[in-house]
């Protein structure tokens, strides 16, 4: 039996691709219904007014308006505020 592993072989060299998570629309940015605002694992940011929560915890806009991030009782929350029509 050989006591040394054959040369030219490697056990490393593989990795999974990044999942492209994070905030997709910034505070104050304009969104339309269906726009993804945050992609996340778990609810790091909680849904607020006029946003929906997907089964993979993606937060998306339900109405047309501007994105607003805020903190309430140690929870980060994202809302979409309706733009006042003139």
Swiss-Prot record:
Record carries keyword Ribonucleoprotein: yes
Molecular function GO terms recorded: structural constituent of ribosome
TM region positions: none
Region (Disordered): 1-22
GO cellular component: ribonucleoprotein complex; ribosome
Family as reported in the entry's similarity comment: Belongs to the bacterial ribosomal protein bL27 family.
Protein name stated in the entry: Large ribosomal subunit protein bL27
Originating organism: Rickettsia peacockii (strain Rustic)
Taxonomy of the source species: Bacteria, Pseudomonadati, Pseudomonadota, Alphaproteobacteria, Rickettsiales
């Amino acid at each position: 039996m050989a006591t040394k592993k054959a040369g030219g072989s490697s056990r490393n060299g593989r990795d999974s691709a990044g999942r492209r998570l994070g905030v997709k629309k910034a505070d104050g940015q304009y969104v339309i219904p269906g726009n993804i605002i945050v992609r996340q694992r778990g609810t790091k940011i909680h849904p607020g007014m006029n946003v929906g929560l997907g089964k993979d915890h993606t937060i998306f806009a339900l109405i047309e308006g501007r994105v607003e991030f805020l903190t309430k009782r140690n929870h980060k929350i994202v809302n979409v505020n309706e733009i006042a029509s003139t």
